[in-house]
Amino acid sequence: MRRININASVALWTVFTILTIWISFALHQPDVQTCDIARTWISTAHVEGFDSKHSRFGEKYSLHLIRASQHAIPQPIRPSGVPVIFVHGNAGGFRQIGPFAGIAQELNDELRLLTKGDAGTEFDFFSIDFNEAYSALHGRTLLDQAEYLNDAIAYILDMYKRNQQEGLQVPESVIVLGHSMGGIVSRVAVTLENYRPQSVNTIITLASPHLIPAATFDADITKVYHLVNDYWRAAFAEGDTNDNPLRDITILSIAGGKSDTMVPSDYVSLDSLVPATNGLSTFTNSIARVWTGIDHDAVMWCHQLRRQIASALFHIVDPNVPSQTKPREVRMSTFHRSFSGSQSLSSAMQDFINIEATPLQDGVEQRLAPGFYWGRNLQMLTNHVINYDSNIDLYERKSGSLLKVWQCRSRQGSSFRQCKRIYPLFVPGINDSVLSHVSVNGILLLDVSKEASESGDWINIDETSMSAAPFNIYGNIVFSTSNMVSQDIAFPALTSGLISYKVLTSGGVGLIRQYMGRNHPSRTYDSKYLIPHYARVDISFHGDGAPFVPFKLKTPTKTDLSTKSYKAPLHLQVFGQGKVTISVDYVGSLGNLFMRYRTLLFSLPTAVLYAVLLLQFWRYYQSGSDAKFLSLRDATGLFIKQYLSWACLVVAGLSFVIKFEFIRDFLHFIQIPATGSSKSYEIETFYGSLYTHIDLFLGISGPIGVVLAPAFLALATGIVVVVTEIVIAVTTLASLAISRGHRKMSLLQTPKNVTIQSSDDPIGDLLHKRTVIIALMALLVLLFVPYQLAFALATASLLALTAYFDAEESASASHDLSTSLYANRQAQEKVGSFINYATTMSVVMVWTTLVNIPVLAVWVQGMVFGRSTIFSSHHNLLSVLPTLLFIENLSFRRMPERGLPFVTYIILGYACFNCTAYGMMHAFMIHHWFNLLAGWLLITSYKRNKTVIKESRIE
């Protein structure tokens, strides 16, 4: 009874914890989504000439042209605009690009009106249809799509050559827009042999997991990620030389934040892949005029975001050059201004000699007279338009008068030298207005025109203000803000994105900006504006301290308060005067674990299953001639009672020690499969920068990892208890159905005078009709089906066998002892022991099948749509044959021999450790560990003089 209570208690705790995490994830601290939906008419046309003659995947995929029009696109297609090609993501569709085509056409029409007849810039939006393929689950599918993308780009560029129009430049490159895994396909494409050099120079990705695959259930996809990321790092390590094939490529990565429940937004970072000269990572919360979290699908149709992307496209294109885009520096400057959500400077410098500049004074809602003004270490907030560069800027900021602002390096008398124009931080105002904020730690120069002076627009000016908070997780801290513009509060101690916080406000605090420090090693722009709701705002951030995400190695720096403040991962910029109180939101923090550790809910329970199985075999081997195999219920209860606390200490210690380099060296040295280098956690990247990441266990170390590790292990143990009960319930119901349906059949009747006999011909036992089925399945694996399907069928077969054995035992137990199938108590115990063994294997195989389902889903989808997909699991008979033979062997009720128990211990022990330490990043190995175990148990059970019950053998 106590064992049942222990199991039940752990199961109830597990259910409660999972529900709490889910409620926290779904309901606590959600990003506010304020996306607008804009309807537009689109027309599509199949690019008919692009067939199997131009790509070996011409019959599998297709290419289309998308236009914002109510009229059909005439054939043959004659493109004439700037080429943009869209690559949809996992199970996506080619029509998703329609809203972008619509907003680009709308923006172009309005700019024509603004410029009074200028021809404007036309775009040709091409889109690839991958037939909703599951590219996130299968590496081979990812490679196929990348190869097809290169073929499509080459064909598109050739179309422009064939249809060249007088006065138009023939494009030699395209802009690629990728959603989700489409962004990864775009990065893979430039690494393949069929990539046409310089045919891609700008890539924009939306919610794309660049660093780590969202699911690691397929070995190929982890290998593709590893090779592609290594290629990009090695290329940029060459700098701007001709040895770098990617030197002219700029890439923008945009994430949706917490609202994206499909891809962890930590994985969008390009920090360790691309230098700042070529790449930018940001969040939709950070982007001016967007300022909202966006879910995984809405990122393609959110009106505010697609408007900003379309505006940026108009900024970076130049139809008069073959590349169709402006130089790399201009493109990156545009990306920073449009998407970083931060203040930036122009690259050009100018001097102001002998000008009459008036010192600025602190004050609110000032109306300045025409002329130059200057100040030092100032910040300003205004509704003026600051430093617009083009008609596109003017279109975006239709209200407000122009104000010119510079940051200067030096001042000598009335001269200001080495001045750069400031592009301000945009701040949301009331009634959908947009304000401009400028902060300068140095010399600020301001030029107020007569028009600006007479416009009635206002300026708030005050000194810059920054303070650091010595915060810890055990309490809260209260700050008073008195600055007339804003006050910056840094939190150097809050370094983990796994923890969420809550801020209570009072007084006149009307807006809080959360952002990362300007000098923080991370270059991912994660900021958001928070409006207090019932005097409260919720704080959470990505990137810093995220599991498995590479981070820059620390270099010796000053440790004074000012340096710590600027490098703090979390800053709060408080607009208004009042009090703010920050504290940890423990319930809200639980939801952060779900997105980061979904795969762990598969790998860690597998480790627990192998630990329990090790305990079962240890008891079985130590019990002598009267060997009894413990039931999974009993073994799990024993594990919880006697070993779980020790196991929690072990995993807590593992989480702590992996922060040491020599420990990680050793763990990578003993890893199966080998990573190729014991220094795999070190990432040598561009310009000598060195990044590192912890790719073991929880992907983090330190106090948070030490706390989370035991909690996750206890949760995994509870999952094993719950799954065990579910499998037992299923087999019990099936056995009841078998008993009722075959009650009168001779198979379940008890023959008299049956004795236990010995099988002297195990080879002959294999000459069984199920052997034909196994041979057929093996042939199909060699020729056509993936081994995951064969494994799933074997699992179903074992469940049926277990149910049959249970039904048979129940039927025999209902007879008197004199007519029992078993002549003595020892035989009954052996049968019960075997059923325990079969039930345990059923649970392990069911759990392993869950890991195989994603790859199996790719194959099933291909069959449904009539597409052939190459699988590495095709022809891989060794990955499932031991399991098939193991199931066949179980049908003869063979138990493992007691010889060589240490081999069983080693296999189970290392499988348990492997699933614990490497399971998150190598979940595909879960299948192979069971297959290895099945092969070994098959060998140990094939011994001469093995006891079986021949009359009960299942035909």
Curated annotation (Swiss-Prot):
Question: Can you tell me which residues are glycosylated?
Answer: N7, N431, N753, N914, N945
Location in or out of the cell: Endoplasmic reticulum membrane
Alphabetical UniProt keywords:
Endoplasmic reticulum, Glycoprotein, Hydrolase, Membrane, Protein transport, Transmembrane, Transmembrane helix, Transport
Show the active-site residues: S180
Alphabetically, which GO biological process terms does the record hold?
Answer: GPI anchor biosynthetic process; protein transport
PROSITE patterns the record matches: LIPASE_SER
Describe the task this protein carries out. Involved in inositol deacylation of GPI-anchored proteins which plays important roles in the quality control and ER-associated degradation of GPI-anchored proteins.
Q: What class of enzyme is it?
A: hydrolase
Q: What is the protein name stated in its UniProt record? A: GPI inositol-deacylase B
**Single GO term (MF):** phosphatidylinositol deacylase activity
Q: Which family does it belong to?
A: Belongs to the GPI inositol-deacylase family.
Superkingdom of origin organism: Eukaryota
Catalytic activity, EC? 3.1.-.-
GO terms for cellular component: endoplasmic reticulum; endoplasmic reticulum membrane
The way it spans or sits in the membrane comes to: Multi-pass membrane protein
Asked if the record carries the keyword tRNA-binding, the reply is no
- State which residue ranges cross the membrane: 8-28, 489-509, 600-620, 643-663, 703-723, 772-792, 840-860, 870-890, 919-939
